[in-house]
Regions:
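Alpha-helical segment of the N-proximal tetratricopeptide repeat
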Residues: 3-34, 44-51
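"A position-specific structural signal for the A-helix of alpha-solenoid helical repeats
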Residues: 10, 44, 78, 112, ...
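Register position in tetratricopeptide repeats
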Residues: 17-18, 51, 85, 119, ...
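A conserved position within tetratricopeptide repeats
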Residues: 32-33, 63-67, 100-101, 134, ...
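Alpha-helical adaptor scaffolds
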Residues: 40-108, 116
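TPR/TPR-like (Sel1-like) alpha-helical repeat modules
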Residues: 118-119, 123-142
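Terminal, low-structured helical/coil segments at or just beyond the last alpha-helical repeat
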Residues: 139-155
Length: 155
């Protein structure tokens, strides 16, 4: 379904890396309808919109990814992140918890849940998820040192 469209996808990624988000989206918009519905394209659109901090549009794309590939964990992580950025943190937490079982072995799942629980005032639960993210991937310890969403755990 994406055969012959690799150049367009690479161009969109390139524009995105240069922070030329409108151009990146414009590239994706040149794809035919059947390609636009492909999970790879939907996810790329969501990521570009997230980089551009266009949270409502990114949320729409991320939710489409969840519908298109309900077992793909990144759709749920992206959806939850957008909801959190829109100030809908409890909903973000609920989306992650309701996602596919495969999420539970991903450090990003636990790290983001820690951020959401911290924002919601559930510090003990936040600490549990944060520690689990560290167990799964030590690099999250570095992220946590400066993440404003986790400030309450550092106090």
């Amino acid at each position: 379904m994406l055969d012959g469209h690799e150049r367009t996808l690479l161009a969109a990624q390139g524009y995105s890396e240069l922070s030329m988000y409108d151009d990146a989206i414009a590239e994706l918009d040149t794809l035919p309808a059947e390609a636009v519905k492909h999970a790879t394209v939907i996810e790329l659109r969501a990521v570009i919109l997230m980089q551009a901090k266009r949270w409502k549009s990114a949320l729409t794309a991320a939710r489409a990814l969840c519908r298109t590939e309900p077992e793909k964990t990144s759709g749920f992580i992206h959806t939850a992140f957008c909801l959190h950025e829109l100030g809908r943190t409890a909903e973000a937490r609920d989306v992650l918890i309701a996602g596919p079982e495969a999420l539970h072995i991903e450090p990003t799942f636990h790290y983001n849940l820690a951020c959401y629980e911290c924002a919601l005032g559930n510090l003990a639960l936040a600490r549990l998820h944060l520690d689990k993210s560290f167990q799964l991937d030590k690099k999250f310890r570095d992220f946590a040192r400066s993440d404003p969403d986790l400030a309450a755990l550092r106090e």
